[in-house]
Amino acid sequence: MSESQSELDKYGTNLTKTAATNKLDPVIGRDAEIRRVCQILSRRTKNNPVLIGSAGVGKTAIVEGLAQRIVAGDVPESLRNKEIVSLDLSALLAGASYRGEFEKRVKNLLEEIQKSKVIIFIDEVHTLMSAGAAEGAIAAGNMLKPLLARGELRLIGATTLDEYREHLEKDPALERRFQQVFVGEPNLEDCIAIMRGLKERYEAHHKVSISDTALVTAVELSSRYITGRQLPDKAIDLLDEAASSLRMEIDSSPVELDQLRREVDRLRLEELALKSENDPTSEQRLRSITNQLSGKQEMLNTLQASWNSERARLNQIGALKEQIDIAKQSADIAQREGRLEDASRLLYATIPQLQKNLAEKLEEQDSAPLVSDQVMPEDIASVVEGWTGIPVKKLMQKDAKQLLHLEEDLSKSVIAQKVAIGVIADAVRRSRAGLSDPNRPSGTFLFLGPTGVGKTQLVKALASLLYDGEIVRIDMSEYSEKFSISRLIGAPPGYIGHESAGQLTESVRRRPYSVVLFDEAEKAHPEVFDILLQVLDEGRLTDSHGRTVDFRNTIIVLTSNIGSRYLSDISLEATTAHEYVNDEVRRTFRPEFLNRLDEIVIFEPLSQSDICQIVDLNIESLNKRIKDRRIVVTVSEDLRRWLSKSGYDVIYGARPLRRLIQREIEDRLAKLIIEGLIHDGQTASFDLSGGAVNAQVCS
C-alpha cells in the first residue's frame, strides 16, 4: 500500500491537501458547473465528467473549487472525505524506456486508485488517446475504458472544444464513458466578481493595493481590445502584469531620483575634467559647476532620504498585508480542524491588531508621494497599450491638443483637400472620445478623385501623425483575379499555402491599431469586396484558420480613380461632375458595399496656386533628406513660379511636379555633391536665369 501510495504521490498532485492549506485561489461563481460535476460523480456508472470549454475560461478552477468544497464539507455524502488527485501524464511517461514499463506503471496506479477511492483529475484529457501508444503498445485511454465503464474509476477530464472533437469524438467507445460539462466564458458582471475574489491574493503577492476601478477596467478593456483569448484569464493576466509593473517601480528608484542622480554624476565628471585646466574660462566654469553640484547634491540627499523613508513604509505595508493574508488562512484551517481556541485568537486578537497597524501605516502616507502603491485604471491601460499598441489611456492634454488641431497638421502634408481632411479628423476624434460604434471600424471611407491629388498622401499623413506610421497597404491591382481573394484571408484547407497567413488578416491581427489602405480599388475583382462587407459592418473577419481578426480599431480607406475624367473636365460645373462620379460609383460597386461606408469623399483637382504650395512641400522634404549632411537647398521666387507652372497638369495632379523637381534640382544637387563642389554646412541656392535652372553654392 505504501509503495503504491508513493506511486500516486510521484505521478500526481493532491488538490484537496493543497486546498486544505489554503494554497488554491478562491473560486467565485461557477456554482452550476460544480453542482453538475458533483451530480455526475455521484452516479453509479459512467461517473466521469469532462469539462469542455475554450482555453482560459476556468475549467481547472472548477476542479479546484470542488476540492475546496470537499475540504469545507459542502458536497453530497457520496463525495465526503474524497481526495482529488491531479495526474501528470508526462511524469507517468518519462523514463518508461522499456516495452511494457509504461503499462506496468499505469496498472499499478489504477490498482492504487481503486483501493484508495480517490478522484483522478487529468488536465488536457485528450492526451490519454496517444499516451504510451508507440510501437504496438497499448494507449492509456484503452487501459482506462473498462474501469470507466464499470464506474470503478472516477475521472474528471478537462479539454478544449477543438481537442475534444479532434481526439475524443474519434473514439466513441471512450467518449460515451464521459459526461460532458460545457464551461462557457463568464459575462462581464461575473468576471468582475471573480476578480474581486482574487484581489486580496494578488495584493498580498505583489504587496500593493488594487483599486476596485482597476478591476473593472481590467475586465472592460480586456473584453474590448484583447481578442483571441477568453475571460477571466485575460483580465487576470492584465491585473497581474499591472501589479507586477508597479511593484518593480517601487523596488527601483523613482524617475525624479534617477534623473537627479545622473545629473550629479555628469556634473562630477565635468568638475574633474575642468580641475586640470588653468585658463580663466575653465576656472569660471569650474566655480559655476561647483555651485551647481553643491545644490544638486543637497537636493539628491533630501530626495534619497525621503524615498528611503517612503520605501520602508511601503515595504511595511506590504509585509502587514501578507501577514493578514496568512493569518486569515491559518484561521480557516484552525476552524476546519476544530482548533477553536487557535481560531478565536487569530480572528479576534491577531488579525484585528494587524489591521490596526496597517491602518496606521496607511495614514502616514505623504500628500505627494514619489511613487504610488495602488494599481489604478491608468496602469491597466498602459499594459493593454503595451500588448496591443492601441492607445487606450485617457486622453492626455498633449493628445487632446493634437486631436483638436488635426486638420491643421494634416493640411501641412496634403494641400487643398479640406473636405476630405475634415471627414477623417472627425472620425478620429469620435473614436478617441469613445463615441464611435464599438462594433465597427473607427471609420470607413471611399476616396475618389484624379491621380496625384493626395488621396494616398492623406492616409500616409494620418498614419504618421496618430498611428506611429502603422499602415497596412493592400494594392488592389494585385487582386484582379477571382482566386486572388485567398491571398487576403489565406488559402482554404487542402490548398497550397494554407499554412501561410492572409496578407490582410495577419497584418491587422499583428497591428490592430492601424490604417488599412486599399489602393486603386476599382482594379480589383468585384467579388473581392464581398469579404469586406463583414469588416465594414461588424469590424471583424475570419481567416482561413478560423481565427477572428478584430478591425474595430482600424480606419479603413479605399482609393479609386472612378469618374476622374469628369472631375478633370473644366467645362463641367463641380456639382454636375460630382453627380456623374457618384453615378459611375453606383454602377461599379454593389449597393450593399456602398451602404456600409461611412463617407464617400471626392477630391478636387489641384489648381495652379495649390501646386505652388506643393513646390514648397517638396523642397522641405528634400531638405529633410539631406539634413544629415547639413546642406540646405533654397529656391528663388522666380524658380518657384516656373516650377509650379511647368509642373502643373490638371489630369496628372502633383506627380509631374515631383518628376520636374527631381530632374531640375535633385539631379543637379547630386552632381554637386559627387563632384565635391558642395560641402557639409553649405547652402545650394537654385534660381532661374534665361529660362534655365542654375545652382550656386554659398557658405
UniProtKB/Swiss-Prot annotation:
All disulfide bonds of the chain are none
The region called NBD2 is annotated at: 399-605
Query: Region entry Linker: which residue ranges?
Result: 186-389
Chain segments carrying region C-terminal: 606-699
GO MF, one term, reads: ATP hydrolysis activity
Alphabetical UniProt keywords: ATP-binding, Chaperone, Coiled coil, Cytoplasm, Nucleotide-binding, Repeat, Stress response
Organism superkingdom: Bacteria
Instruction: Locate the residues binding ATP 1.
Output: G53, S54, A55, G56, V57, G58, K59, T60
Assembly behavior: Homohexamer. The oligomerization is ATP-dependent.
Matching entries from PANTHER family are given as:
ATP-DEPENDENT CLP PROTEASE (PTHR11638), HEAT SHOCK PROTEIN 104 (PTHR11638:SF18)
Could you tell me what this protein does? Answer: Part of a stress-induced multi-chaperone system, it is involved in the recovery of the cell from heat-induced damage, in cooperation with DnaK, DnaJ and GrpE. Acts before DnaK, in the processing of protein aggregates. Protein binding stimulates the ATPase activity; ATP hydrolysis unfolds the denatured protein aggregates, which probably helps expose new hydrophobic binding sites on the surface of ClpB-bound aggregates, contributing to the solubilization and refolding of denatured protein aggregates by DnaK.
Q: Which protein is depicted?
A: Chaperone protein ClpB
